[in-house]
């Protein structure tokens, strides 16, 4: 195996993993669970401080197992019922009695949530107290990246800035491009990448749940009703939109099922997975070809997103769906050049979509970017592509750099404005 291939596998395993619930409030639940474990007893008060972006993405989304929204219930539930060893599945097991106990803590005014100024896009600090005992847990740079733990003011764990590598910089120093990802996905031994098939299983179950039960805006179920009424057809495009949205409906609606996430986002894990799986079914390819396509989609998404901060005013479903579209071209028998066309087309189509927090309507954004992925891969197969127009360069690598530049240099004030509007 080529030396960098093991690096690619390690990257995927590090940031493509099961996550129960929207990862921003779950970060608070995880920090609270770790703080409770450090404290040794259930706390009688909890203080939560978060970055603006983490706050934004926690305002409108349900916390699994609670039927409730927000950072306060996430932190309280994490402290009462969370498993500190379960990472993003910290709330996998929670009872109604524990939810009631967490809510009682909130109702008594014992849980506070504040925004704090920080250069970190992902930042959460939880202070749990019991009498005169106090435990502090600080997360920085990634949803489960613990930077510091303190007990009664004494440091028991800390990492310096060189060790605390943010998930957003995961590709730094790695020899990786769209072409190297494409070749890796095609040529790496199947046994080395079989693990990615779990993404199909987990996100497929979430989609089934969203179709079977009413969650959020019921985008997927609404599409199904349209098909049943004969208003729209059950073709590949509409199936992808319907089933991808259904998974997001369930996730944003608090379904007690994990998503296979991508770089800290469950919705983006869904967008990287379900369109690829349905395309594989359409073309009747082997399990091995599906695994290779999923690797292409997930690693492609990680690579593109490594060019900008992990949380921003930009909806990451756009570039995730661009990577999915690349993989769809591969499944349809297209060339590498046509896979690049697909990326260019999706980014041209949907790059104006902003992130205004995690909430039920994310299912609509997931469906929008996924529909762009289908259109774009079909155009690419006919060798139709956007090139040298607007922010789309003549070369896919330059386009990816342009996206990063647009977000880093051009959207910071947009992010502040969105957060101000949401907080008003």
Curated annotation (Swiss-Prot):
Coiled coil segments of this chain: none
InterPro entries: Ser_deHydtase-like_asu, UPF0597
Disulfide pairings: none
UniProt-recorded Gene Ontology molecular function terms: L-cysteine desulfhydrase activity
Signal peptide: none
A GO BP entry: L-cysteine catabolic process to pyruvate
Sequence similarity: Belongs to the UPF0597 family.
Protein name: UPF0597 protein Sbal_3070
Biological source species: Shewanella baltica (strain OS155 / ATCC BAA-1091)
